[in-house]
């Protein structure tokens, strides 16, 4: 069973149910999960440090209790997030050592009663807000933990870091409440956790909102001010949409640095592992209108990583005004993201609306040293969605800014057919041109921006809306009508541009550009006759007499 991301107990039931019941992307694509059972082998790292259950006290008290645990006789075996010295290279050293040995599938079975609990029973296990880490100290952040159970079977280790010292955070049943639905007691032994979430007064200085969640494989997600949980990021993507099946690395352990009282920065370190690669990650999180997360990662491949995706994002697209064939839904649009935006190495802005295709499809956009890319939720009007529970207009965009020169490669977009909004079916990532060699150390850095999409300069012309339908109302026809509305950002639209529309097949006719007063921009309309083609790549550009920053519209039409 693939671990899936939970958005926490405080989110709406709609969002929680989607997160807990979403299928893996490989399964949604009709692929197999590529982690075959292996023969038991000795553990990679011999555990030496004991762990301890930490009662609900101040951090200073927690430190004293952890130190006193050295004399305790405990059966808990801490593999990674041990009570030990800690510095900026600690996780890198652990990942390097891990990669030097064959992968071992860790087996940490839950007690039988917890291993097979239902969705409703899992939801009945809640973290006590009063037990939040650092709550008693009045720090700008608090941390809560996720219990294991249901889809979340993997044991995740967590350590708290203060200065040069890491202290293992053992499982404590007193951190949780279990209601009448669960009808069983929580275990007393250290079973670990399934993830963590960071809280911060993002929207109200008097309330600690959920800010960021790590749970399920290498999935994580965050919020900007005023947004709701939507799309997710991952530590790494491997073999996405490949016939042999996708491989899902997992964050095995986290080290969370104690935040300072006078800073809005919190730092989380993570250890990644899978059959193909081990890795060390450092997340520097700064919340705000847009939440910025600086990611520093070092990969240690066990095998050549050929089909690897860096900075992957995972989202959902069910339908929009661009193609609602066979859609019986009162809501005009249903999606967490409506397009892929790319700012390539040449400075060209590419806008590629998403699709829910009949068959799995993969698009690749070749580039050299991209400036940024991401899955964007540009439509912010409630009227576009009409969903009082899901509120898709509040879902964040996720923009990826590479730091340094990422060289040659391609932005890859994978679109998977789905018939339900609870299934994530969109993936984007950067694929380097050259494989990452086995035995090497591959370091890369990037920034994730959660919230609004990147600001553009005044006068920039961006795509505001894409719609399509049959070209004739009175009778059926294979010809398609495309209507693209553009918006001028804080500028005038005195000049009517000339449109250049290209297609890889078929015939494009009746190209018309007019003013669109509702967007302070333009409307481009054209017809496309596919003729015998089953797949057509479309490209539309607006040409002005002088220099102007204009988004290039791209789309893949399929029969």
Swiss-Prot record:
Summary of the function given for this chain in its UniProt record: Involved in the biosynthesis of osmoregulated periplasmic glucans (OPGs).
Lineage summary: Bacteria, Pseudomonadati, Pseudomonadota, Gammaproteobacteria, Alteromonadales
Signal sequence range: 1-37
InterPro entries, sorted: Gal_mutarotase_sf_dom, GH-type_carb-bd, Glucan_biosyn_MdoG/MdoD, Glucan_biosyn_MdoG_C, Ig-like_fold, Ig_E-set, MdoG_OpgG
Transmembrane annotation, as ranges: none
Pathway annotation from the record: Glycan metabolism; osmoregulated periplasmic glucan (OPG) biosynthesis
MF terms in GO: carbohydrate binding; catalytic activity
Pfam family, one: MdoG
Key words, A-Z: Periplasm, Signal
One CC-aspect GO term: outer membrane-bounded periplasmic space
GO BP field: beta-glucan biosynthetic process
Organism: Shewanella frigidimarina (strain NCIMB 400)
Entry keyword annotation includes Cell cycle: no
Protein name: Glucans biosynthesis protein G
Protein family per UniProt: Belongs to the OpgD/OpgG family.
Compartments where located: Periplasm
SUPFAM superfamilies noted in UniProt: E set domains, Galactose mutarotase-like
Source superkingdom: Bacteria
HAMAP family per UniProt: MdoG_OpgG (MF_01069)
